[in-house]
Structure formats: C-alpha cells, structure tokens
Amino acid sequence: MSYKFPDNLNYADTHEYVLEENGLLKIGVSEFAIDQLGDIVFVELADEGATLEKGETFGTIESVKAVEEVYLPFSGEIVSVNESVIENPELLQSDPIGDGWLVILKPESKASIADLMTSEEYQSKVVPK
C-alpha cells in the first residue's frame, strides 16, 4: 500500500499527526499506523474541555488486532472532539488525514511544531526504502 504524507503535517514518534491551523492543533493518527491496526471497531476520546499534559493519553483505538492508546504531542485543552469518528470508526481507515481526525487542541503555550518530525522524516522512518 502506498501512504500519503502531506507536507503540511508533522508527526510524533507515536504516529500521531499534527496540523496547525490558526493557533490550534488538529491531531489524528497517521495513515501508516491505522493500516497497521487493521479493521477499526471502536474509538474512545477524551472529553471536550479536558486539559491534558504532553504525552498523556487522549484516547484509544480498538481494532480486530489490538487496542492502541493515542498520545498528545503537546499540553493543552481539547476544544473539539470528532464525534463522527466515535460514531463511525471506519472513518479512521477511509480518511485518517481528512474526516478521520481525532481532536483539536488549544496548546498551553506556543506549540513548537519543529519538535516533531516533518512528513519526509516520518516517511523515511516508517516506509522501508
């Protein structure tokens, strides 16, 4: 399978992607990681308004193969939760970077996206040459 690695995304070591928009961070899970999980059957996310620290779990994704936790790459307040993904977990497989985003975070302080991997760096980490 060929994966998409859009240039406007940055990635954490734990496979979450971050898209910065107007000072807010849209966070989801990479297409590569979702593909590794197989068929997604259940998604649970933290509540809107929750304030969490960098590295804390903000949800779980359950597939036929495994249950994986998802982690915040930055501290902040969750200002929006994608209810569509909770109701239709298959959105994570069909469109993980588009409609399959998980949460929108208002970072505690100016988020340093530079601390994350670029799309190119992430791609070289997960896709064998």
Curated annotation (Swiss-Prot):
GO cellular component, one term: glycine cleavage complex
Biological processes, Gene Ontology terms: glycine decarboxylation via glycine cleavage system
Taxonomic superkingdom: Bacteria
Record InterPro entries: 2-oxoA_DH_lipoyl-BS, Biotin_lipoyl, GCV_H, GCV_H/Fam206, GCV_H_sub, Single_hybrid_motif
Similarity remark: Belongs to the GcvH family.
PANTHER family per UniProt: GLYCINE CLEAVAGE SYSTEM H PROTEIN, GLYCINE CLEAVAGE SYSTEM H PROTEIN-RELATED
Name listed for the protein in its UniProt record: Glycine cleavage system H protein
Gene from which this protein is expressed: gcvH
